[in-house]
A protein has these predicted regions:
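Glycine-rich, aromatic-lined ligand/substrate-binding cores of catalytic
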Residues: 811-846
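Short, small/polar-rich motifs associated with maturation and membrane association
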Residues: 1-304, 309-311, 316-318, 390, ...
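A generic beta-sheet turn/junction motif
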Residues: 7, 125, 273-277, 286, ...
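Extracellular/periplasmic, surface-exposed regions of secreted and cell-surface proteins
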Residues: 41, 97-100, 300, 306-315, ...
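Extracytoplasmic gating/loop element in the C-terminal half of outer-membrane beta-barrel translocons
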Residues: 838-946, 950
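Conserved small-residue
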Residues: 157-244, 491-502, 506, 700, ...
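Acidic, glycine-rich flexible loop segments
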Residues: 213-251, 264-268, 337-392, 397
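Short aromatic-centered micro-motifs
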Residues: 101, 552, 780-781, 824
């Protein structure tokens, strides 16, 4: 038997788009990049670019969220390099900062990308690859190339595609179904109503019926019994159709009652035409989304116009305009409390298992007040803490719109000797408007808020490029010089009402009950006579840059690339606003040394060194006065409480990396391995100073963060025949992140902490990875970590709480990240699937803390190891088992076991600690699944309608969470910070995509 291994058509001379739009042969690059094809990004109709990249790029960590948020998520390349996050605060620093997104040469945001137009994505991971982007490329770059018409030939094409998906919520939380609402205790009994003088006459019919504690928003009530009838809260409401109706004392709380089936309809139409001297393409997309939360939805609209032509010999002109419109209405929010648009998390943290949510869909009484399950008493319908979830859905209206206008114009002239000169202008215009109205909810005044943001970011760039070969084409040379000017302008305004509305339901700033004066004393602009406060602000930034790159190659085997850039930035001190940096990389195509090895198709070695600087946000160096409270008609102002170090220097990142890439066995097996080390020094941070200085903090250079890690990508085609093909790819990455030094006398820098129950903090600590977690309240333990038990006044052994010792409990940083994808083609059918995973990385769950503290969680019920009820009496073998030790008189400890009453343990002890609710964030999640049928050419030709290609696909996004170490929440949807404070419900989408090309 003779076995022949067919080679793959993988092109080893692929041309990729690198920094500043320069096109290079992939074999010549001395740094790590990863290109993802359109088919791997758009097969399931992902709505966001970052969602589509999840698990497909080695070293890229995807930080996502629920589909109910209509959010694009973000990616982080190679960990964090800063002690402050993207927004300038420390809280998100350990999560890392995002790369820049460059769409057809224009720096914009991931939110501005229309996935229907994406042709390819090239991810530049390190400073050596992104040095030509200057300060903005320090965290990597995602280079997006959109579809073009085929310039240089007569061509005309129309493409129509539609993706229709249905989205459902799925609930991770496991609730106990044995005990009801209130705080009576497991052995308690429901109260019995007896009519009395002063009660409504209609209540006489309710005499003798049972009810419970409606006001206590927990589930520590009596055991369920289907033989017992009781009056739910709504049964006391004479205006309700449920008046006087009893329910069985059983579990009625079903979280699925909170949601509806969402629908997303995405249609794209594109037209392209080209000839010898011109090309043009127009693309239009419209997407309407109905959310899984009632009264929620989103709109996405895109337009893309690309044209290029040659009016004169050697002169090429191109123009590109992209428009993006995004509107979100009542997108789910996350957080602890009742103000968020997230009744799901609210009910998981505080709720009653006996409540039938459907009874409260009609939440408005004839007098305009709201019904709720959480009334104060049967004769007081005022909500104790919580409104009907349907009131929250409908009486909070939170709408935001974002508009992106991305423009680029380019003119290039070809001179003799392969020299080209060009000029490019790009502009990224951004408009944001948010309107928030809240009416009549519990314990909250009616409010009207408006936020408005506008910005433009304009680049003017001149360039000279040269590309030639010498010495019988053995020596190749490329060079480019750029001069660039950037103007950035940002302005915003915030207007809030104060102390409620004069006329309920009239949401206008002029309808504010209170006058201005500012609940927010940090406002930095004039406060006027309307609203809670009226805050307006403007930021401007200018930068001048001169940079260039040179690439030399010998025998198509050896390559060296050098780049150099100097920036002058307006946000830095005059004496330090100029900074020079650059990079050097080398590559050798080692497979050319072993041409006799037929099994070795391609092998490259590479190494690089680079530096890149970063600047401040505008006005951080200025001592400015801010407007504060208004006293009558007199405005007040206060100075900046921060001391500014006038010698602040730019932050500098220095990076080294080495790597190799290969392809063997007829390009049937390929891989890429990379190791990097990255030091970021001169961190610009705010440190505390003594009160005698007259300031509260000091802005200064301090800190060195070191990132070291590796990235491995492997792929192969075990099967490749005419009718069968199987492709499999996987990647894994490890990043070791450490704070090496801080300012003299400093050993730690606070990154995050909870605003309530402030016993858990995240620090950047010298000698440890970023995001070290400490608690200041924990179980009291001996040196072996055993819980110490002591007798209370009743003589029962109880676990002790240590309120004085700071305890290290782990780190936020994951140990490994990666992904896996596969595609199987059988004739004209192709099955695709992709997953991503994370190993390690701690986070704290508020949801789990209050699931147990409120008695909702399944862990608070059931039986213990003695066969008794966890909520039963200790004397009857009930209670929660706690293993620990007791102290002996000689200072030693002996093992001991005790049982603690469930409410005392979960609500009085455990839920006052953070340590039990800090979890390993490891997970494996299937992100995409699709089955596509591509109509064969023979069938298309028989239709005689000009159809060039046609396909239909079954698609699914986020269909399964395959593995998780934590219950009740989804670790893949934490936002990358320390706390999960109340997740929006997880979603999965299923549907169909049809694609036609004429």
């Amino acid at each position: 038997m003779k076995v022949v291994l067919l080679s793959d058509s993988k092109n080893l001379d692929d041309v990729v788009v690198t920094a500043q739009g320069l096109k290079r042969q992939k074999r010549s690059l001395g740094y790590a990049t990863q290109e993802i094809k359109s088919s791997d990004l758009t097969s399931v109709g992902q709505q966001g670019l970052n969602n589509a990249l999840a698990g497909k790029v080695a070293g890229a960590r995807f930080v996502g969220g629920s589909g109910a948020k209509f959010d694009e998520g973000k990616i982080v390349l190679r960990g964090t390099t800063s002690l402050s996050s993207d927004n300038g605060t420390a809280a998100g620093a350990a999560a890392g900062s995002s790369p820049i997104y460059v769409v057809d040469g224009v720096i914009t945001e991931a939110a501005a990308v229309n996935m229907n137009d994406v042709a390819s994505v090239n991810v530049l991971k390190g400073p050596a690859a992104t040095a030509l982007y200057g300060v903005r490329g320090g965290n990597g770059a995602v280079i997006i190339t959109t579809n073009n018409a085929k310039e240089g030939e007569a061509h005309q094409q129309i493409n129509i595609s539609n993706t229709l998906t249905w989205t459902t919520a799925y609930n991770h939380a496991k609730l106990q179904k044995e005990y009801g609402g209130g705080a009576y205790g497991a052995d308690g009994e429901l109260d019995v109503y007896h009519w009395k003088e002063g009660d409504p006459e209609s209540y006489k019919q309710l005499d003798g019926k049972k009810y419970y504690d409606y006001a206590d928003d927990c589930s520590w009530g009596p055991r369920f019994d289907s033989n017992i009838k009781y009056l739910p809260a709504i049964a006391w409401d004479e205006t309700s159709p449920y008046f006087g109706q009893e329910d069985t004392w059983t579990s009625h709380l079903d979280m699925n009652d909170l949601f509806q089936t969402g629908v997303a309809d995405n249609t794209n139409v594109s037209f392209e035409r080209s000839g010898k001297d011109f090309s043009s393409r127009i693309s239009l997309s419209n997407m309407n989304i109905k959310g899984v939360n009632p009264n929620s939805g989103a709109i996405r609209r895109y337009a893309n116009i690309k044209t290029a032509f040659t009016p004169l010999k050697n002169l090429r002109v191109s123009f590109d305009y992209k428009y993006t419109y995004k509107k979100n209405h009542n997108a789910a929010t996350e957080g602890y409390g009742t103000e968020s648009n997230n009744p799901y998390s609210d009910l998981l943290q505080w709720g009653q298992t006996n409540v039938n949510l459907k009874q409260y869909k009609n939440y408005t009484r004839p007098d305009g007040s709201f019904r709720t399950w959480n009334i104060k008493d049967y004769n007081d319908f005022t909500p104790a803490f919580h409104d009907s979830p349907y009131a929250v859905y409908n009486e909070i209206n939170n709408t935001n719109t974002r508009e992106f206008h991305v423009l680029a114009g380019d003119i290039e002239y070809s001179l003799p000797y392969n020299i080209k000169v060009g000029f490019k202008t790009t502009a990224n215009l951004y408009n944001f408007y948010q309107l928030y109205n809240r009416a009549g909810l519990t314990g909250q005044t009616d409010i009207h808020k408006q936020w408005q943001r506008k910005s433009y970011d304009v680049y003017n760039q001149g360039r000279i490029t040269w590309d030639d070969k010498f010495i019988n084409d053995r020596l190749s040379a490329q060079a480019a010089i750029f001069i660039e000017n950037r103007n950035y302008h940002y302005e915003g305004m915030d207007v809030f009402t104060r102390d409620g509305l004069l006329l309920p339901g009239l949401f206008r700033t002029t309808n504010s009950y209170g006058l201005s004066g500012g609940d927010d004393a940090s406002t930095d602009a004039t406060t006027n006579e309307v609203g809670d406060y009226d805050k307006a602000y403007t930021r401007r930034e200018k930068a001048q840059s001169l940079f260039g790159t040179v690439t030399l190659g010998w025998d198509d085997t050896y390559f060296v690339d050098a780049s150099l850039r100097n920036d002058w930035n307006s946000t830095l001190p005059t004496d330090n606003n100029s900074y020079l940096y650059g990079g050097l990389s080398v590559a050798a195509v080692a497979s050319n040394w072993f041409k006799q090895a037929k099994w070795l198709d391609y092998w490259k070695l590479r190494a690089s060194f680079a530096q890149v600087g970063s600047a401040l946000t505008p006005y951080r160096l200025s001592t400015v006065y801010n407007f504060g409270y208004r006293y009558g008609s007199t405005a007040s102002m206060y100075g900046n409480p921060q001391l500014i170090d006038k010698n602040i220097k730019p932050t500098i990142t220095t990076s080294y990396e080495i790597g190799t890439e290969f392809s063997v066995l007829g390009n049937r097996l390929w891989g890429d391995i990379n190791y990097y080390s990255r030091d970021t020094k001169n961190q610009i941070i705010s440190t505390t100073v003594g009160p005698a200085s007259g300031y509260s903090s000091r802005l200064m250079n301090a800190g060195l963060i070191r990132n070291r890690g590796y990235e491995i990508s492997l792929g192969g085609k075990p099967i490749k025949t005419k009718n069968y093909e199987w492709t499999i790819e996987a990647n894994i990455a490890h990043n070791e992140n450490k704070l090496v030094e801080l300012a003299p006398g400093m050993t730690r820098y606070t990154l995050d902490g909870m605003s309530f129950f402030s016993y858990l903090y995240s620090y950047a600590e010298v000698g440890k990875p970023m995001g070290a977690l400490y608690v200041t309240r924990s179980w009291q333990t001996n040196e072996n970590g055993d819980i110490i038990l002591k007798k209370n006044k009743a003589g029962n052994l109880m676990p002790q709480i240590d309120k004085t010792t700071e305890k290290y409990i782990g780190n936020m940083q994951p140990k490994l990240t990666g992904g896996f994808s596969t595609a199987v083609r059988v004739y004209d059918f192709t099955l695709r699937a992709s997953c991503d995973f994370r190993v390690g990385g701690k986070f704290a769950s508020v949801t789990n803390m209050w699931l147990e503290g409120s008695g909702l969680g399944s862990a608070t019920a059931g039986t213990n190891d003695r066969g008794g009820e966890i909520r039963g009496d200790i004397s009857e073998n009930g209670g929660v088992r706690v293993d620990g030790v007791v102290a002996n008189e000689d200072g030693t400890y002996s093992p001991a076991t005790t049982y603690v009453e469930a409410n005392t343990y979960f609500n009085g002890l455990k839920s006052t600690l953070w340590e039990p609710y800090v979890y390993d964030g490891s997970y494996i999640k299937m992100r995409e699944l699709s089955l596509t049928y591509n109509m064969p050419k023979t069938l298309l030709n028989q239709l005689h309608i000009g159809l060039q290609s046609a396909s239909i696909a079954f698609v699914a996004t986020d269909p399964f969470l395959l593995y998780s170490k934590v219950k009740n929440v989804d670790p893949s949807e934490t936002d990358g910070t320390l706390f999960e404070q109340g997740q929006a419900v997880s979603t999965r989408s299923w549907g169909f995509t049809v694609n036609l090309t004429f």
